[in-house]
Curated annotation (Swiss-Prot):
One Pfam entry name: Ribosomal_S4
Gene that this sequence comes from: rpsD
Location of the S4 RNA-binding domain: 96-156
Protein name: Small ribosomal subunit protein uS4
Organism annotation: Yersinia pestis
Annotated function: One of the primary rRNA binding proteins, it binds directly to 16S rRNA where it nucleates assembly of the body of the 30S subunit. With S5 and S12 plays an important role in translational accuracy.
Keyword field contains RNA-binding: yes
Family: Belongs to the universal ribosomal protein uS4 family.
GO molecular function: rRNA binding; structural constituent of ribosome
Matching NCBIfam families: PRK05327.1, rpsD_bact
Keywords in alphabetical order: Ribonucleoprotein, Ribosomal protein, RNA-binding, rRNA-binding
SUPFAM superfamilies to which the protein is assigned, alphabetical: Alpha-L RNA-binding motif
GO cellular component, one term: small ribosomal subunit
């Protein structure tokens, strides 16, 4: 399955919620009719079956983290193998992706931009360049911007935007040095309450 390259707001409208695919701190509902699906008949909100609701939730989470279908299914399988709650495990695995950590630390304005920084070899983990977006960051790992990338205007702009967002408690970031520490794996209570991971577990359990 190819990565979606179309309008980002269209995806958020499809899911009926802000997927945080655009940079900035202005609420997305001031930019478009977020509650109305895209298309000519968007105002007619279809009534979904249980399966439809589960599928929409899976698509929403997959799009938030920018993960392709096969990758997402593999994350679910890994989450199911781990001890504890499968849904919480799934979200923790997604949060541990390097591109997501770079975004959470404020080095990229969006997850897509953060993924690009990683693929362009602008990110280091524990002093070594890592260019794999899906790399799993471990507790106490130090994530930093490579020296020659620190002058990039997009990195500076992203850090300014990050100052206006709530800072994740599981990360420690030094904006001046452009580096941060992944202190711990986030608890489920640390993450968005707008995600209903139980629906995803129900979908894949069938």
């Amino acid at each position: 399955m190819a990565r979606y390259l179309g309008p980002k707001l269209k995806l958020s409208r499809r899911e009926g919620t802000d997927l945080f695919l655009k940079s900035g701190v202005r609420a997305i509902d001031t930019k478009c009719k977020i509650e109305q699906p895209p298309g000519q008949h968007g105002a007619r909100k279809p009534r979904l079956s249980d399966y439809g609701v589960q599928l929409r939730e899976k698509q929403k989470v997959r799009r938030i983290y920018g993960v392709l279908e096969r990758q997402f299914r593999n994350y679910y399988k890994e989450a199911a193998r781990l001890k504890g709650n499968t849904g919480a495990n799934l979200l923790q695995l997604l949060e541990g992706r390097l591109d997501n950590v770079v975004y959470r630390m404020g080095f990229g304005a969006t997850r897509a931009e953060s993924r690009q920084l990683v693929s362009h070899k602008a990110i280091m983990v524990n002093g070594r360049v890592v260019n794999i977006a899906s790399y799993q960051v471990s507790p106490n790992d130090v994530v930093s911007i490579r020296e020659k990338a620190k002058k990039q205007s997009r990195v500076k702009a992203a850090l300014e935007l990050a100052e206006q967002r709530e800072k994740p408690t599981w990360l420690e970031v030094d904006a001046v040095k452009m580096e941060g520490v992944f202190k711990r794996i986030p608890e489920r209570t640390d993450l968005s309450a707008d995600i209903n991971e139980h629906l995803i577990v129900e979908l894949y359990s069938k």
